Amino acid sequence: MATPVESGTVPCSLEPFDVYLFGRGEHWDIYRVLGAHAHAQDGETGYRFAVWAPNAHAVSLVGPFNDWRSGDFPLFPVGTSGIWAGFVAGMEYGRLYKFAVQGADGTVRLKTDPYALYCEMRPGTASFTWSLDSYAWNDAAWMQRRREAGPPLQQPVSIYELHAGSWMRRHGEGHPFVNWDELAGTLIPYVRDAGFTHIELMPVAEHPLDQSWGYQTGAYYAPTSRFGTPDDLRRFVDLCHQQGIGVILDWVPAHFPKDDWSLGRFDGTALYEHLDPRLGEHPDWGTYVFNYGRHEVRNFLFANALYWFKEFHVDGLRIDAVASMLYLDYSRKEGEWLPNVHGGNENLEAIDFLRELNRVVHEQYPGVMMIAEESTSWPGVSRPLYTGGLGFTFKWNMGWMHDTLNYMRQDPVFRAYQHSSLTFSMLYAFSENFVLPLSHDEVVHGKGALLSKMPGDMWQQQANLRLMYAYMWAHPGKKLLFMGGEIGQWNEWSESREPDWCLREFPAHEGIRNLVRDLNGIYAQEPAMHRHDHDWSGFRWLDFSDYGCSVISFARFAEDSPPVMWVFNFTPVVRRWYRVPCPRAGEWQEVLNTDSGYYGGSNVGNGGGAVACTDNWHGGHFMELTLPPLAAVALKPV
């Protein structure tokens, strides 16, 4: 048992302006006011504890220091703010605690601090007294470049999505997770070598259940203890920045779990959520939905988003399940939802919350990314606020993902009849600032790995995967690939095991990784491949109509930079003397061929290049190519 803290609690004051801003929902550093913080009072040092529980009958501090007995260390109301606070002299750094909240219903619940900075390892749910002020950053050059560059709409963004708990694991008995330092030593060189510009971490805030992958967050301000301390995560981000790699976090403001120790019914009432389950509960996930109309709840979430940018220097947040926030009838049958004041299904409070969130984030941290996982056709998700948009930097292109995977699943014999699945995305490619995602959602729950979705024998499956990756990297939009996809993983992902890294011993699988590296290289090095990812000036169809041969071709453009021309053959038939329109006459170099033996292909190609001639009849230019089977060819002018 820990040494008792003899003094108990005494009242302490909070700055009136802090309380005022919190009541308005506009205190961006509220996590430095509420929660547990080192404090000096009346000549003594210790910790100040503060928690918002406006409907509670009583709140006290419990922990090993008082054998978890409620009532021994009472907190005191701070005026009429709904905040309870108290000072404990002699309380030290690194001590476990919880709040014992006697709710409006008379029940005493032991609650995790909503503003906890660090928590114990699951299944424990207590918080530690902690500090935010001990880490010295070494990424000033990166942060300055990010500020000066602004949002990366015209920059290459290629994201490697990963689950920190399964990218690398300890084997044998005991704790299965590696810490952030161990992960950094292996992951950062790997990602850098593969040419990705950013890492996206699935949620790293504390969560009780491994199988939730972090999407049911229990403590929003506490990096999970599975991988080390908050400073360990800071060091991981710092090291990424020093190696030129950005870090994006998945963030979950759409819902939270019903666990009794967490935010739900925090003071015996529906405090963070709506009371009516038609508004306050999510039927798919069995979770609570935040009350976005309550100032203090909005403040909790606004400040949390800013917290990751300010205290952890992250470069972006990917907001999960945005569609579930926008629609009151999301995944609900008639009678299971309530319309808004205008009779519609739009969640007006959530819409206002998202718009204000993006305004504040971009105002406070220019150059960072706010990315929406939004699966419907809601207009203007990534359009500016002044045009009526939601203000996100990017939106996941779920339509492109579904159509592409649907097309690639087809036997090549039948692809001619699905040709529109391949070309339809260009009708809306510039309606939003899109990220093309091949994410974790596509390789779990019986969906199979990307490679296993491909038709044909083993060679054809691998060729199809290489072809799909080339199509993805050539298509307008930023890129996202989930871990394991770069080596042609056969098994679908599980949070309890690593990718099958042994596959890298096989040339065909290492060839897929080589291709991803080279695709990232072309994407980053050729301005035509990324500068106009979000407008028509960077794209031109050469031929989209040859559905009979399942061949398409297009070119990418940027001012003061040579174009890059792409030709795709979605059948296993080698097509010789295939005539393709091209942007200009002269010599063209073959800069990438997914059928190269280096990638695991059959080495059918064009001898390193081709010559484009002028078509005197039509006044354009063309070249005749040999199209490899199930392959893509990229060319640029010499």
Curated annotation (Swiss-Prot):
One of the GO biological process terms: glycogen biosynthetic process
Catalytic residues (positions): D320 (nucleophile), E373 (proton donor)
One Gene Ontology cellular component annotation held by this UniProt entry: cytosol
Keyword Glycosyltransferase: yes
Entry keywords, A to Z: Carbohydrate metabolism, Glycogen biosynthesis, Glycogen metabolism, Glycosyltransferase, Transferase
Catalytic function, reaction form: Transfers a segment of a (1->4)-alpha-D-glucan chain to a primary hydroxy group in a similar glucan chain
A Pfam family annotated for this UniProt entry: Alpha-amylase_C
Xref: Gene3D superfamilies: Glycosidases, Golgi alpha-mannosidase II, Immunoglobulins
Pathway named in the protein's UniProt entry: Glycan biosynthesis; glycogen biosynthesis
EC number(s) given by UniProt: 2.4.1.18
One annotated GO molecular function: hydrolase activity, hydrolyzing O-glycosyl compounds
Keyword Glycosyltransferase applies: yes
Family named by the database record: Belongs to the glycosyl hydrolase 13 family. GlgB subfamily.
SUBUNIT field: Monomer.
Physiological role: Catalyzes the formation of the alpha-1,6-glucosidic linkages in glycogen by scission of a 1,4-alpha-linked oligosaccharide from growing alpha-1,4-glucan chains and the subsequent attachment of the oligosaccharide to the alpha-1,6 position.
Protein name: 1,4-alpha-glucan branching enzyme GlgB
